[in-house]
Amino acid sequence: MASLQLYGVKTPGLALSSKRLEFASKGACFSVTLPSSSAVFRDVEHSCRNIGLRVSCEALRVDLLQRKEPETCDSSGTGKELTCVMKFGGSSVESAERMKEVANLILSFPDERPVIVLSAMGKTTNKLLKAGEKAVTCGVTNVESIEELSFIKELHLRTAHELGVETTVIEKHLEGLHQLLKGISMMKELTLRTRDYLVSFGECMSTRLFSAYLNKIGHKARQYDAFEIGFITTDDFTNADILEATYPAVSKTLVGDWSKENAVPVVTGYLGKGWRSCAITTLGRGGSDLTATTIGKALGLREIQVWKDVDGVLTCDPNIYPGAQSVPYLTFDEAAELAYFGAQVLHPLSMRPARDGDIPVRVKNSYNPTAPGTVITRSRDMSKAVLTSIVLKRNVTMLDIASTRMLGQYGFLAKVFTTFEDLGISVDVVATSEVSISLTLDPAKLWGRELIQRVNELDNLVEELEKIAVVKLLQRRSIISLIGNVQKSSLILEKVFQVFRSNGVNVQMISQGASKVNISLIVNDEEAEQCVRALHSAFFETDP
């Protein structure tokens, strides 16, 4: 009998008569019984020519040895992998005390090996934007006196001291922020690209402080900037989209590092890197949820946990009606509609990676961790469900577009929506009849602009549409969206109109979307909150 050991990067094409051939899943290791050594040695040597293998012959066994991938293991060496994402928003890490509570919360789940995603400390993003706006006009010599800059420095340095970590973990970023504001002041402009770079300091500092604290208390952690670990986006500054190349890149970095050092990853939410510009981009406000679900899909984790300051998804905004209740289960469709129409719990686009990866999302309250929260999955039993939640979207502009040209004609709707496309204005809710179209404009895409720009855009829009129709512009409207089982729309609408009639409210527009989970109604702004409270009482506090 004989044994061969082959060392190299490719498996030679050998024609061996074998009684036993075994392949490991990762190691490309085989054993084979041979009748003699000399003939096989010549065959192997010939087959391995130009492949770069070293061949040696011993007795008893043949092994092809190849470098094995490092096994993933936890700090106790048990070979365990990362299990979930835990994402915490700004209010959950707004102070040293809250960061300590979050750390204790994480440690209270000893069976979890989480990836942590953090937002900036509470109010930091708004303060950074305000500081940037002031820097444009204040002059270079006055940058130091910008109130918001002083607030940010004081908050983060105080937090470092109270956590008992070295201020050196954030000093470079505080100095970088100061220099950036000076640059903005010198240039006298704040571009979208610079705005994204400016707000990135918030997440970069919060994650460094939190990671340092975890290490201080003996829980090994490592900080990551999302834009350095593979979050590749479009170059649409302030509202970038994540590209598919992100998923393998993020997986390679996080899984590879975890397998080597078992340090809990602490990742910046909200941020990415433009694929052309290589500049820092942001995913839009609330984009930390999208960061969390993207990581969950990239790593194929068991669950994505989004920790907020409310007990999961609620039946309505508790600021409008304090008696709002927690919703135990949602589908991704329901969650997406809730987010789009104004619920502040989830980012509108954050559900897509979780849905694609079929990964449950659990929304919980970091102030009340024992509360069950809300679990969002691909499907749920809707047989007894009627209404899930009521969402209010304020300050909406409504357009009534009427023309007899619509009657029996084709192409009219195309002309209308081409006008919106040409002016870069998003449409929210749409309803049509034989001779008219009613629609609302997405305030998130319109009201974020300067007042003068908004007025000009609306004037231009009306002017263009009046070339083909009679246009009526109606402002100060609200959308009340009813999220639930639209298969029971007759029952829902019957109760809705009973409530509105008893409160003397007229519905100006109604739309049922193709999502099959949403009915939207348009009312005057001043009537909206009254309607939400009355609807909540009718659907959630009385017998069906």
Curated annotation (Swiss-Prot):
Transit peptide, from-to? 1-84
- One GO biological process term: threonine biosynthetic process
* Family, similarity comment: Belongs to the aspartokinase family.
Molecular function as annotated in GO: aspartate kinase activity; ATP binding
Described purpose of this protein according to its UniProt entry: Involved in the first step of essential amino acids lysine, threonine, methionine and isoleucine synthesis via the aspartate-family pathway.
| Gene name as annotated | AK2
Binding of substrate, residues: E203
Q: What is this protein called?
A: Aspartokinase 2, chloroplastic
Species, as recorded: Arabidopsis thaliana (Mouse-ear cress)
